[in-house]
Amino acid sequence: MERDFAMIRRVGIARLLHVAMMVVSCWIAAFSQNQRDLVKGNLIQFNDNGAWCWYQDERVVVDAARGNLILGTDASASGVGGSPRSGDVEAVIYDLQAGVPQRFTLREGESRVFYCDDHNSPAFLIRQDGKYLAMYAAHFNDTSSYYRIYDAGVWGAETRFNWKTERPGGANFQTTYSNLFYLSAEGRTYNFVRGNNKSPNLMFSTDMGDTWSYGGQLTTNANIGYNNGYYKYWSNGVDRIDFICSDYHPRDYNTSIFHGYVKNGETYTSDGIVVDDNIFDPLTVPSTADLTTVFAANSVLQGITMTRCWNIDVQTYEDGTIATIIKARANDNPANPSQDPDNRFIYCRYDGSKWTSTYLGKAGKKLYGSEQDYTGLAALHPNDPNTIYISSTFDPRDSSSVGVHEIFKGVTADNGATWTWIPITQKSVRDNLRPVIPAWDENNTALLWWRGTYTSAQNFNAAVVGILDRRSETVGPMSYVDATSANTLLADGSTLVTTGPDSLAGPADNTWHQRMGFGNGGFVLTSAEVGSGENAPMLKTRVSAPSAGAYDVWVNFWANPTADWRIKAGLTVGGMQLFRQMACKQVEVGDHNATIVLTGSGNTFLYQAYLGRVQLSTESEFDVYVDDEAIRVGTPSTFTGDVARTWYDGISYARVGPVVSVTERDTDPRDFVLEQNYPNPFNPMTTIRYSLPQNVHVNLKVYDLLGQEVATLVSKDMPAGTHDVTWHAQNASSGVYFCRMAAGKFSKVTRMLVLK
């Protein structure tokens, strides 16, 4: 220990303390200004107007072979674009390499059938030939399913499957929801809907979804209330489709939760008992009571009587376990059910022989008046059975109220018996709702949700956002580039001429204004600050990176968290998006490699919007296009000043590179050991050696002086032996860092010094 401190003194402890004090003082200043909209991770906007229900799957899919993420939503007149987008069924194909989304309209909204309704969101399937299949239906409005196929950059014409004409005897109930699955062992594609007899029905295809036939009815119940059950599905893609269901709507009945699965054209209980020997004929259609009970109404957990259950998510894993998350009302009066019940989250797990249940925490009150059981929902991780995410107005760590719906990550080390929680969003101004995680792989996670104001399923002002966690890469600290006359022109290349400079709001004259006293560099470029707004010309800021390589890029703008300030930006003119502060995160202390201004007077803060990734080969410069858009949200073209203003400050970029290289050594250690890194001090690489006496899961991470995670070097099961890990710290600033290793019950921290 003394040698470590002596070493630090030799390289300049005064310099390190100076850096640390600057960071700490900036941190104190930022949080004394009531910083809001904090997110753990790089927040990405996928669609500026959209929401989804949770009974259509898959809502999001990853095409790893082509590097795409595909998602679907329904748009609202209350969001960006106003009434012309109302009810549009939309698909977004997000380029995972470039970090840029492309939005398509699958079906334009209209007032008769496809009016705005989040139940109309599409489901997707990546076909065996690489084409994308999208399926959607209108909520409670007709008896049809609609589908389109994406190939070579184009969505084909819409095709209609009319259940009333395709089902023998017709259909007596409207079609809602879409759930697409392909079983390679059968060569069949399935789509499950709510339809005839208010029950789950299926259609199937033997040509990957080009044409379809009626299949059958999955279950049947006596008619009670709105419909006969809600179904969540998951498939292994080979020979089995699992489903979790309720018997009715929890508003109409004290519902329980059941499980079954389809295999070889038959329906089974959890333990493999056949309850329907042919799902394609109407002779034997089981009821939900014939399936395996997962969680019965009136069950007691932690002294709380749970009633009126509803399913949220289901997932099967390679080891044969099945997991589901449900919600239930806590201590509700069965004789006089609450109109605003106390909803709770419950985790259920099947270990191959029995179902068990674990209380997770409070889910919060209803989302809006007529839907007492609508909550923020939850998501199981398809590639990690030990990880879940929930959306709640209560912190699951202590049940304290957080005001709005926040996203929390739960991790278990004992098969779901207990959970450790980490907040993903904090101090949000608006709700974060309905998280979803598509299947990817063990090293990559996509977490998506939508953020905004949810008035009803037919009226919302929300944007789809999310985080991509890719363990194979590291993103260094950001570098900030202030937008000035030296690097910013009009997009056509002509000189930027502004009004000002002064400390006042700029006039509504369709010209950018230089407003002093805010931002980095002492000013911001502003538009639409007063009156009925304005339309200033598009800008282009040129950024010089230090070298060739891959860089993530953000635009920085200022906003009042409770207003609707925004900026339009992109790496190309055609790729520009409108970013409102409600769908963005605030910049935090420590994000950049130098101290920058994060807060201003009048409850203003610096926000960031992710624009994508640039690949620089020989040239080390790139352009960012920036514009205003003072059109009032919820209208197609009404300009407005003040609330829709733009305050542009500058651009941030960060180097992207591989995390580490790992070398395994043939040794037989007797104990857990974390050695001091070598060399130390170092620039830019150092090697960390650790030894394991047994096979164990290892977490090896680097933290800065504030305790913020800088890099994950190892996070996986490792074999016994001695291993070398190299940390590439080319994007880290000078200073002290800590390397922490956790392996089983072993934990140790060492100091490292980056000196540049």
Regions found by a protein language model. Give the residues of each.
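Extracellular, repeat-based ectodomains that mediate carbohydrate processing or recognition
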Residues: 33-477
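N-terminal secretory signal peptides that target proteins for export/translocation
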Residues: 1-14
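Glycine-centered coil/turn sites that cap beta-strands in beta-rich domains
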Residues: 663-678, 682-702, 724-727, 743
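Short beta-strand edge segments in extracellular beta-sheet folds
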Residues: 751-756
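Bacterial N-terminal signal peptides
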Residues: 17-29
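Extracellular and select intracellular beta-sandwich modules with Ser/Thr-enriched
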Residues: 647, 746-750
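Short, surface-exposed loop/turn motifs with a glycine/proline- and acidic-biased composition
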Residues: 713-745
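Extracytoplasmic
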Residues: 321, 405-408, 460-461, 468-469, ...
